[in-house]
């Protein structure tokens, strides 16, 4: 008899909403030269092919910094920089074109065979490159001529869209031509960022050597707003880091987010499957740079009833929460606050005020099992306490049988039944023997 894998079933169920959400959307993927050199690059290419097979429109932008540096070293040619930007003279330009051209051929070949040895073997991936970008020179700064180092002048986004709509993957590198026919060396982060903005991409995705941006303790920061990301860039640059995959992608992500790209993702090129885990799981694996959090704390509406019921049912069955019917929830939905992440209700709580006695009850506190080790409970407590203060209440009480210490650690003190509002005293269940805890607001 074949073994049944419940883990596979659960994983597929969780990923299906993201498959549907991503289908038909445009993603810009930025691959630095470091990622291309890494042993895991073949897996990354295979995963890019898988994304394409799911109906996602893909623009892949590759960089070549380490390959260019290696070419310069081989030819005993010293690289030159001004204000941390490479000066591309004629000799350097030829070596840049050589490195970029080799990478383009290599990546095209790998993408063309990315679905081999998979159930999708035989499916054809059309990879298109072209003069979609027109460049212009950086010019002269402080008397220093950047020569063939350039910037983007314009992008033919309509031509790119035509290729994407025809089912092709668009592959672009760091070299573009000008209206005069000259070639210019661009930065991959500028190319990826401007493409994401002009194409109105849903996402921009970049790879670095770590799993994302980390805090002082070394833990991954799952979400950054542009201002926070800019502060991180400033810190890295002050430490002398101008060219790592992290700082280069963050620069682009900040600009992209402020220009309308909803989410930019930074993940590791060393971790097999990081791209799929980031895109097809609720919490991802790296760092997102977003204008608006994927997680919202808000007052519940009638549309949240199904999510709240799904969240509290297991706790009701365990006797942790008092059972509530759908009808009761519909009548009391205005009392509830929810934490929602990607349309999933992951936490809830309710405030029942007793204004005549200047006290309120915090009830039906529930947090999804996957998020109990984080701060969602504290988030709800802060929101409920703020609502209570706005209503002029002076105290907040809870009735609990299992979370006594959690509430006490947050300032709640034990109390007797006589401390409850009169209406609540009359309804107190002496068989359940819930502990009464009160917080002075």
Curated annotation (Swiss-Prot):
CDD domains, alphabetically?
AAK_NAGS-ABP (cd04237), NAT_SF (cd04301)
Pathway connected to this protein: Amino-acid biosynthesis; L-arginine biosynthesis; N(2)-acetyl-L-ornithine from L-glutamate: step 1/4
Which InterPro entries does its entry note?
AceGlu_kinase-like_sf (IPR036393), Acyl_CoA_acyltransferase (IPR016181), Asp/Glu/Uridylate_kinase (IPR001048), GNAT_dom (IPR000182), NAGS_kin (IPR033719), NH2A_AcTrfase (IPR010167)
EC no. given is 2.3.1.1
Q: What's a GO cellular component annotated to this UniProt protein?
A: cytoplasm
| GO terms assigned for molecular function | L-glutamate N-acetyltransferase activity
Tell me the superkingdom of the source: Bacteria
The keyword Cytoplasm is assigned to this record:
yes
Any one Pfam family here would be: AA_kinase
- Indicate the quaternary assembly: Homohexamer.
Describe the family membership recorded for this protein in Swiss-Prot or TrEMBL: Belongs to the acetyltransferase family. ArgA subfamily.
Provide the protein name: Amino-acid acetyltransferase
Organism listed in the record: Pectobacterium carotovorum subsp. carotovorum (strain PC1)
Q: Show the taxonomic lineage.
A: Bacteria, Pseudomonadati, Pseudomonadota, Gammaproteobacteria, Enterobacterales
The gene coding this protein: argA
């Amino acid at each position: 008899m074949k073994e049944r894998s419940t883990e596979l079933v659960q994983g597929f169920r969780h990923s299906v909403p993201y498959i549907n959400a991503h289908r038909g959307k445009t993603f810009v993927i930025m691959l630095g030269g470091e990622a291309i050199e890494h042993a895991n690059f073949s897996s990354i290419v295979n995963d890019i092919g898988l994304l394409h097979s799911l109906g996602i429109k893909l623009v892949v932008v590759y960089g070549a910094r380490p390959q260019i540096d290696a070419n310069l070293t081989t030819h005993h040619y010293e690289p030159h920089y001004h204000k941390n930007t490479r000066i591309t003279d004629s000799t350097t330009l030829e070596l840049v074109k050589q490195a970029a051209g080799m990478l383009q051929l290599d990546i095209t070949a790998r993408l063309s065979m990315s679905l081999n040895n998979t159930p999708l073997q035989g499916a054809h991936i059309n990879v298109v490159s072209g003069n979609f970008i027109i460049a212009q020179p950086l010019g002269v700064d402080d008397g220093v001529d950047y020569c063939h180092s350039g910037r983007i002048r314009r992008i033919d986004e309509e031509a790119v869209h035509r290729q994407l709509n025809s089912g092709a993957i668009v592959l672009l590198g760091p070299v573009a031509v000008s209206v005069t026919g000259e070639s210019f060396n661009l930065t991959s982060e500028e190319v990826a960022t401007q493409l994401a903005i002009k194409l109105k991409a849903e996402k921009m995705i970049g790879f670095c050597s770590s799993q994302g941006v980390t805090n002082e303790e070394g833990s991954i920061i799952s979400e950054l707003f542009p201002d926070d990301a800019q502060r991180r860039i400033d810190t890295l640059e002050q430490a002398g880091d101008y060219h790592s995959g992290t700082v280069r992608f963050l620069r682009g992500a900040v600009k992209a987010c402020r220009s309308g790209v909803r989410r930019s993702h930074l993940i590791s090129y060393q971790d097999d499957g990081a791209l799929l885990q980031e895109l097809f799981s609720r919490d991802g694996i790296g760092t997102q740079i977003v204008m608006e959090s994927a997680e919202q704390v808000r007052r519940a509406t009638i549309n949240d009833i199904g999510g709240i019921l799904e969240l509290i049912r297991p706790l009701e069955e365990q006797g942790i929460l008092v059972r509530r019917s759908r009808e009761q929830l519909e009548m009391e939905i205005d009392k509830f606050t929810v934490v929602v992440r990607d349309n999933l209700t992951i936490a809830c709580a309710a405030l029942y005020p007793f204004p005549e006695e200047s006290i309120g009850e915090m009830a039906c506190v529930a947090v999804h099992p996957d998020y109990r080790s984080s701060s969602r409970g504290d988030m709800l407590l802060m929101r409920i306490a703020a609502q209570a203060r706005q209503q002029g209440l002076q105290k907040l009480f809870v009735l609990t049988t299992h979370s006594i210490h959690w509430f006490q650690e947050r300032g709640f003190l034990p109390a007797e039944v006589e401390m409850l509002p009169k209406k609540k005293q009359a309804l107190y269940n002496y068989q359940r023997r819930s502990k009464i805890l009160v917080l002075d607001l």
